[in-house]
Amino acid sequence: MDFFDFTKDFRREEAPSGFISSDPSSMATEMFESKPIKREVIGTDYVAEIAAKEKLLMSGQLKAEIPGQYSGGMDDLDSNDDMDDEEISKIRLDEEYYKKYRFNLNRDKNLPIYAKREVIVNAINTHQVVILKGETGCGKTTQVPQYILDEGFKSGQYCNIVVTQPRRIGAISIANRVSQERMWEPDTVCSYQVGLHRKQHLEDTRLLYCTTGVLLNSLIRNKTLTHYTHIVLDEVHERDQDMDFLLIVVRRLLATNSRHVKVILMSATIDTREFCDYFSTKVSVPPVISASHGRKHSIEKFYRDQLGSINWKDDPDDGYQARIPDEAYKAAVKIILVVDNMERQAANQSEQSYDDAKSQGAVLIFLPGIYEIDNMAESLGNMTKEEPSMKLFIVRCFSLMTPDAQRDVFSPPPSGFRKIILATNIAESSITVPDVSYVIDFCLTKVLVTDTATNFSSLRLTWASKANCRQRAGRVGRLRSGRVYRMVHKLFYKTNMTEFGVPEMLRLPLQNSVLKAKLLDIAPPIEMLALALSPPNLSDIQNTILLLKEVGALFPTVDGEYCEVDGDITFWGIIMSRLPLDTRLSRLIILGYVFNLLEEAIVIAAGLSMRGLSTEAGRGRLTSDAYWMNYVFADGSGSDLVAIWRIYRTYENMVANGMHQESAEPWARRYHVSLRALKEMHLLVQELKSRCSQLGMISFNLSSSDMPDDLEKAILLKVIIAGAFYPNYFLRSKKTTLEQERDIFHVISGRDPCRTVYFTNFKPAYMGELYTRRIKDLFQELKIPPESIEVTFQPGSQKVFVTFKSDECDTNCTRLINVPGQVLTEVYKSIRMRLYQSNRTFRVMDHNNALNYVQRHGIGTLKEGHWTPPSRPLNVEMLALPSVYEKNMTGLITHVDHCGKFFFQPKSFARCIQNMSEIINTPMHLQYEIQNAGVLTKGMMVLAKRKGTFERAIIVRPETQNNRQPKFFVRFVDYGNTDLMYIEQLRLMTKELLSQYGDLPPRVFECRLALVQPSTMSNTLSRWSRDAKDMLISASKNNIVEIEIYSLVYNVAAVMVHTRDGLLNDKLVEHNLARRADENFMSRQDHDFRIRKQESARYISGPERQQVNEEYLRSCQMPEDLDLTPPPLDKCNMIVMLKGPYSPLETSMFSTIRVGVWKTVKIDNSSVNAVLLDSDPQDNHDQLVVSHSTVESSNGDVLTARGTTLMPNIHGFGPLMTMLFCPTMQIKCNKDCTKYVSILAGLGFDKETMKPYFEEHDMVMNLDVNLYEDDVRMINQMRYNIDTMFFNFEGEELPSLNMNDRVTIYKELRKLVNRLLSKDRSYIELNASNSDFNWEKEDRIEPQPEPFGKRCIFPMHVIPELLEEDIGRRLYLIDNCKKLYKWRNFEGALDILNCKLCNMSLETTPQLRLHLLTQLHRDREKQIGFKNE
């Protein structure tokens, strides 16, 4: 019976088998149909015709459509093409306004821009568009708008100027600086407007600084430029999407209804030729004005080929790949050494000392990312070890750095140190450090690129542009002459590196730009984006439109007809365009409104859009403490998004309670949270609430009786997360075959995988039992106390097994961190510890010294050179455990912790318990009252008072030992309960009692309910609820209870509790307090063993049965932790490299969408799900994980899921969410049409060509539980209700429903969600097919009526009709079942049998027997009406 022997290796040959899994890559052979076809990239050939037409329009040779005429318009036009109105606007006088405020015409003449003042003013007066190129610091941003305003003052003409800034902080600070310079009251003549800081009263404002997005949204809303006389677009070189689209809008409106508005383009590094061509017409070319100023200090530039011996050799196969080899880091270190030596020598010939030169000679090293910063810091650290005289003050500088780190960047270094700043491209322009004298530029950058066909983003390492490098070089020479070292060859820099970077419109998602084009309503999105300065590929626009249809922003149709490259905008699309968020985050807010979780959705969306909420974010890996703070905030939800909500709520509560900065900072440091990011997040939350309110989206006012409780709210929150981020769905891989289940336990030699981890590479010759305490010390950094750890070994194995004990009275802080499922938190912490450090050094004695040590100290026994560790004697016949031959037992349930842990006292022990109690409670045995609490130690047996009499008890721990009367937690040995007792309620045991009862095992045994697990609908952590506990207590109140023993594993009996109304286990399922579940492999194996022994009991004599039972009970005992005193460290002369710890429950995920099926999936290192374990190992059903976003590796092979949420372990949850939130789907039946077996979801397909519209995002969910026609009807009802919530009549801006109707829909949705998720669904066999991704014609199926026609976001699903199982097929399956049971007790070699019910191949008799015990097979038997006689 090697199958059950965990000490032996287990191997098998692969054979066809069925199992419960949705993993397409593991269930089907790789065929052409199973992989997506690579979508053809269509370039920019479409642009030429559209651009030529636009040039004619700009020259006045072609009449333009009035904005809004393209599709009838959604907003009333504020302006039209009436030239008289523009003439009036142009000559409007504003003399009264100029008298109201002080206008001083004296400008700063020291600024370089002043020399060009007259040229600039004249050019603006005579040209529609002017291009101004001025170096950073010349004064263009503050002065040019003032020059224009001064001209207006002189002529008395109306002037209204708007100036855009790429960053919020820039708009605010510049507006304040101009107001201060002109001595205007803030927010009068000059003001600012940014997304999160909006001034309410701007009537008197004539000079407005705003972010690019604010102006863009204003122009889209008004569809004219004539609200302003002058539009100044600053920093146009940055080329973000908002700027590029703003240029499209400005150019179009200049050519249509705003010909007299003046536009000024400004930048330090503008490509003047490109912008001139863009705004040129046949009759007008924009003038270019340059304003520059010379530098006070010179800058020398050096390239790699000029570094002499510092240069390194290239790999001939490298081909100038964008990367930093190890030699390049070393070269940078050598440059610093050269610089230092150069300054040391110069100090001898200069008045400036060497120390002064160092303090002013900071080195700024530009690196592409955090990983490279860490590598550079490590190289510098190694150098300082070799050169102690080199004292370096190393500072990291990146976008997510903490405020303390920012201060270090600007602060002078400690005396005698040189400051080395390791920076990303944030230091190009956002940060200026005056004391930088040297720049080492690796000429690299990281850019975020999104594949529009997959919506996967990837951070790619690429060569920086020359413009980037010039900006970086400009960081030196502020206080003295400087040097720039570019770590590329000069020829490569000049010929291979591009002049400018790739604009966002060519590398980032285009959703927001397309939505803006739809709102502007001038032309279809393709025609609008073709007018961009750098038009995107046509395929990118097409893919973006598909993505917008997927999220519900666009209808699939235009005027009722399907259009591949366009779609009418939905009200969801309008909402998404008005919220400053990614479309999926806006979708989260929309669904939050639908399910009355608007507050939660807004906070989560704001948090996900913020960078740097965690102070450790952006680093290569989170520190242990920072990572576990995420767990604290996630509170067992398995969701990064819930953690964001709880962080914000904690911060908000502290602010409301008057928390000051002094107390806020320690809190933020403790929980590794950025206060700055939280404050920004708070502003964004307020902004989102305001915008939602304007859109009619406010929370419903419900009575207290209608409010969902916390449990229902937690499930609804995960429902809307699943809806918002469809199709970012992943399934957690399961151990789906019997062999895989067995392997879980084989790896840890039969121990409990939910509480055990293991190390490897520890040879038996090391005699590990000597070092158990030292192994426990490895977990000190996790704050796991040694008394909560058991360390054991397996003879002949190189593994060290570490098992964690659970104790409800334990004060271990680890227990304060909740995790979902059955796995202990300590296991998660241990695996996370390995991710930081996979190998741990461990000191041991060599084998000979160890043998001498144990012999000298009398530890264990030594025989013929073989050491046997000491062991405690065990009389298994004294254990109060059920015999292998006992199926049913009667007795008392003495104590209930919950349905997964209660204690049973067999009726046969009643007399023993009574006699022992009588002896214990005689006066002579109660005479030792405890005067000094110090005599009590953990684990000591005492007498404690229980219900008026004293009983045996074990000291668990003291509750307190201060000035108050001491209390102790004690566990009653013979009853199982733990209570807190005063010291006077305790007695020391007499010697007589100790000798008589001290070694007597407990007269109870621990039980749990078999074949059921807690319902997720009653507890999101998969813990047993109070209601379930009350039902068990109620069933045990009538004293004697009958239980049926299913199995005995780890001395815990899995039982069924009989009541007058049937099995309690079944009653809990009926009341939705439990769900039916498989037992784990060990339990099923034990159950099978017990059944066979019980069947053969009548053929075995009494003594033989007793011997078999003793052997059985002895085999149930696990090795003990000996807790020996370890040898002194000075005697441990060998170093062992321990590997681990590992868990057999470590698992992975796979993507459900077609484009991701064959890719490896990882979870972001900072996620609470980064340690992904199979938290319910006995449950062979898929569990859904949803990510906020997905990042693709540079080679495209690996996906990283970010912002993940582990969905509730409700069977069928993934398919139900897919059906509820997908654009459309087909539910497929088995070949007999008797059950639904899979779901194909996506945007649908062309009914003529049968090709999918968006095959990359088509998703397959194979069903492992039964779904019925009624389920699909409920899903359709919910989809209809969601659409109804946003229904509006033509011409109405907001939805038509009043608040009462919305509340009614919300209540109906809640009721339907509860009905769907509360069903106890029977298991079905897997029906995998290579055609799962093929859309099929549904001509024979009656389509569902569509209340909203083709203008619905969630159309009704077609419902295939299910047929009854054919009687012939049923008889065939019943006959197959009989055959399986016939072979069940066969002991010889077995030919492969097939279970036709479950599509399972069975190769051995043990496999057959254990398969027959699975919930899948039992459910299938029930479905065909089979009963084993």
Swiss-Prot record:
Q: Entry's InterPro entries? A: DEAD/DEAH_box_helicase_dom, Helicase-assoc_dom, Helicase_ATP-bd, Helicase_C-like, P-loop_NTPase, SNase_OB-fold_sf, Tudor, Znf_C2H2_type
> Helicase C-terminal domain location, by residue?
349-521
Query: Which biological process annotations from GO are given for this protein?
Result: dorsal appendage formation; germarium-derived oocyte fate determination; global gene silencing by mRNA cleavage; heterochromatin formation; intracellular mRNA localization; mitotic chromosome condensation; oocyte karyosome formation; oocyte localization involved in germarium-derived egg chamber formation
* SUPFAM superfamilies reported in the protein's UniProt record: P-loop containing nucleoside triphosphate hydrolases, Tudor/PWWP/MBT
UniProt domain Helicase ATP-binding: residue ranges: 121-288
Matching PROSITE patterns: HELICASE_ATP_BIND_1, HELICASE_CTER, TUDOR
Task: Outline what the protein does.
Answer: Probable ATP-binding RNA helicase which plays a central role during spermatogenesis and oogenesis by repressing transposable elements and preventing their mobilization, which is essential for the germline integrity. Acts via the piRNA metabolic process, which mediates the repression of transposable elements during meiosis by forming complexes composed of piRNAs and Piwi and govern the methylation and subsequent repression of transposons. Involved in the repression of LTR retrotransposon copia.
- Name of the protein described by the UniProt record: Probable ATP-dependent RNA helicase spindle-E
